[in-house]
């Protein structure tokens, strides 16, 4: 039996950002990301590649101010695309978990695509105050927006490390691997005793 490809496109135009993206869950890790913020491009590329997704994303934002609007709006669009592509979430494994080392750094990501948005953000004392020219809080806000739009319970824990780039890379790869597990089709029904994920 042939299954329908899970895919979604999202466009968002505001006074702060103009975003267009297409996400394919059953992809080959083909990723093209251009946001104007190189570190965000790098982390999104890692997440999509490790998830096995195809992602084509462009964003033109008010980077003359800072990267905050760009990061948050990209996260909202990415989460919306994931939620749309998963539709009623019927048949997915739903839960994913990964720990990924990057040199001296280790992060853990656990998620449940449950329909109940939540972000638990731990260990950010290991992150330096500024990474790639932006305050570290930008990354918490990115993940919060993503979890909210995807209707996902997302826990990100930085367990140890010193280099901000390494810590972010560890978490981004972990998010990709956890998503790969959670979106896997492994049954015909919704994995919930209440019969729905909302």
From Swiss-Prot:
The source's domain of life comes to Bacteria
Q: Which GO terms describe its biological process?
A: L-histidine biosynthetic process
SUPFAM superfamilies in the cross-refs: Ribosomal protein S5 domain 2-like (SSF54211)
Where does this chain mainly localize? Answer: cytoplasm
Quote the pathway field: Amino-acid biosynthesis; L-histidine biosynthesis; L-histidine from 5-phospho-alpha-D-ribose 1-diphosphate: step 6/9
- Catalytically driven reaction(s): D-erythro-1-(imidazol-4-yl)glycerol 3-phosphate = 3-(imidazol-4-yl)-2-oxopropyl phosphate + H2O
**What UniProt keywords are attached to this protein's entry?**
Amino-acid biosynthesis, Cytoplasm, Histidine biosynthesis, Lyase
* PROSITE patterns membership: IGP_DEHYDRATASE_1, IGP_DEHYDRATASE_2
Coiled coil, from the record: none
**GO cellular component labels:** cytoplasm
Q: Name one Pfam family in it.
A: IGPD
Keyword presence, Amino-acid biosynthesis = yes
Q: Which GO terms describe its molecular function?
A: imidazoleglycerol-phosphate dehydratase activity
What EC identifiers does the entry list? Answer: 4.2.1.19
Could you tell me which HAMAP family the record lists for this protein?
Answer: HisB
Record-linked PANTHER family: IMIDAZOLEGLYCEROL-PHOSPHATE DEHYDRATASE (PTHR23133:SF2), IMIDAZOLEGLYCEROL-PHOSPHATE DEHYDRATASE HIS7 (PTHR23133)
Q: Which family does it belong to?
A: Belongs to the imidazoleglycerol-phosphate dehydratase family.
Name this polypeptide is given: Imidazoleglycerol-phosphate dehydratase
What organism does the UniProt record list as the source?
Nitratidesulfovibrio vulgaris (strain ATCC 29579 / DSM 644 / CCUG 34227 / NCIMB 8303 / VKM B-1760 / Hildenborough) (Desulfovibrio vulgaris)
């Amino acid at each position: 039996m042939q299954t329908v490809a899970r895919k979604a496109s999202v466009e968002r135009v505001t006074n702060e950002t103009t975003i267009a993206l297409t996400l394919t869950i059953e992809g080959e890790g083909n990723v093209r990301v251009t946001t104007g913020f190189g570190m965000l491009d790098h982390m999104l590329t890692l997440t999509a590649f490790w998830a096995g997704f195809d992602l084509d994303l462009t964003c033109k934002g008010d980077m003359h101010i800072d990267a905050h609007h760009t990061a948050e709006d990209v996260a909202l669009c990415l989460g919306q695309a994931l939620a749309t592509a998963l539709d009623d979430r019927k048949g997915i494994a739903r839960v994913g978990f990964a720990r990924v080392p990057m040199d001296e750094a280790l992060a853990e990501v656990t998620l449940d695509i449950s329909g109940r948005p939540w972000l638990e953000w731990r260990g950010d004392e290991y992150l330096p105050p500024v990474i790639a020219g932006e305050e570290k809080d930008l990354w918490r806000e990115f993940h919060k927006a993503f979890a909210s739009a995807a209707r996902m319970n997302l826990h990100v824990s930085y367990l140890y490390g010193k280099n901000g780039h390494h810590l972010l890379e560890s978490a981004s790869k972990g998010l990709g691997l956890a998503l790969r597990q959670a979106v896997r089709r492994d049954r015909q029904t919704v994995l919930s005793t209440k019969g729905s994920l909302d």
